[in-house]
Amino acid sequence: MSRIIREAQPSDMADIMQVMDAAKRIMRQSGNIRQWGEGYPSEVVITADMEKNGGFVVEEDDGEHQLSGKIVGYFAFLPSPEPTYAKIYEGKWITDTQPYYVVHRIASYPNSHGIFSSIMDFCFSHDTNIRIDTHRDNKIMQHNILKHGFTYCGIIYLLSGDALDQRSLATKGTQERLAYQKMVSR
């Protein structure tokens, strides 16, 4: 089976949203009920990724080694700075002085195995310093992140504002994210 990763296009939107819906179902079935609530990620968010040239789709072949153009995954791969990464709590980044890329909104169909590996291969072929975060309840993503050699660095909060406000919102379990970083040498 072969895959290609390419920049997402506006004409991909319906397929991307189907992948997002499938990913949400996987999350809910695995006990992750608080991440990616109703309406997120929206077409507006995906369009913003595309406008930054940071929205990507994963296409898979049809089993006969012919690319079918079937979109089986989506992710955002964006250059620093990431505003929510400016403050990290209960830890620190491996390095906070070098530019990095961030990976957000990884989604795939449940029967498309190895998507995370394909995405990481793509990302590390473009940059050597990558950060990623996920919800505390997203055990599947945490497993994949650690399996691919990322280091847990601490906690970040999605909303801006002072730390006390962020921490009180986080007690509801919706804004807190576990943050990871991996650096490789070329």
Language-model features and meaning:
Residues 4-18:
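A short beta-loop-alpha structural element at the N-terminal edge
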Residues 24-44:
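Conserved GNAT-fold acetyl-CoA-binding loop/helix
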Residues 52-75:
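Conserved beta-hairpin
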Residues 76-111:
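Conserved acyl-donor/pantetheine-binding loop and adjacent beta-alpha core of acyl/acetyltransferases
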Residues 108-125, 142-147:
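Conserved acetyl-CoA-binding loop-helix of GNAT-fold acetyltransferases
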Residues 126-137:
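Conserved GNAT acetyl-CoA-binding A-motif
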Residues 133, 151-177:
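Conserved catalytic-core motifs of GNAT/GCN5-like acyltransferases
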Residues 136-155:
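Conserved active-site alpha-helix within GNAT-family acetyltransferase domains
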